[in-house]
Amino acid sequence: CAKIQIIYNFKQFILFFRLLCKKLTTNVMEKAKVYFTDFRTKANGDGLPTKLKNLIKKAGLADLDLEGKFVAIKMHFGELGNISYLRPNYARAVVDVVKELGGRPFLTDCNTLYPGSRKNALEHLYCAWENGFTPLTVGCPILIGDGLKGTDEVEVPVAGGEYVEKAKIGRAVMDADVFISLSHFKGHEEAGFGGALKNIGMGCGSTRGKAEMHESEKPAVHADQCVGCGVCAENCAHWA
């Protein structure tokens, strides 16, 4: 896999973001190429998916050697009842380009810590299917990166890691030859916003990895206020 800097802790994320902003404001950067397209769709099929294919080729995907390689396309399949995730059509556009280049793509994400529709591989897959992500719609298999219960992981040493010495990453992510992050911008209650960094740094973590990253927010029981209602136990996905 190509070397990617991963942020494993929200404190590190904020520090990294501040340093990045400082660098952007103090250094003279090379002008970026800006591409424009409209939202018009023509009868010949020249719509947004086709325009997206052209964009990712221009961005450099077409220059990669993908022949015969396993290509992990990391994305978020959305929770049930949520419609703010990327559409399957966009994932299909990336998959098609990877196939054109001889790659062997698969969509992937790792299980979540919190109770919901993505806390184990079975529910995660059903959630993805109901939200429109199926092998027929996206054109490739869907693999949950850290396995059935989030225990299929690889420990990756973090050089000089202050908070995490060994990151726990989903095995399917680490086994891939090429890694592509397909992410969307969203708000976050602690970091302010989430995008590509969170999609990789948090999203590729196994269940243990995510637990480690959230250690600063461990729940606690105030025994003097507990009434024994059991609501906390009902809402814990891991029976802690």
Residue ranges and their predicted role:
Residues 27-240:
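N-terminal and secondary-structure boundary signal
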Residues 6-20:
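Hydrophobic alpha-helical signal peptides and transmembrane signal-/tail-anchor segments
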Residues 2-5, 28-29:
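Compositionally biased non-globular segments, especially hydrophobic aliphatic-rich helices
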Residues 15, 26-27:
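N-terminal compositionally biased, intrinsically disordered segments and leader/signal-like regions
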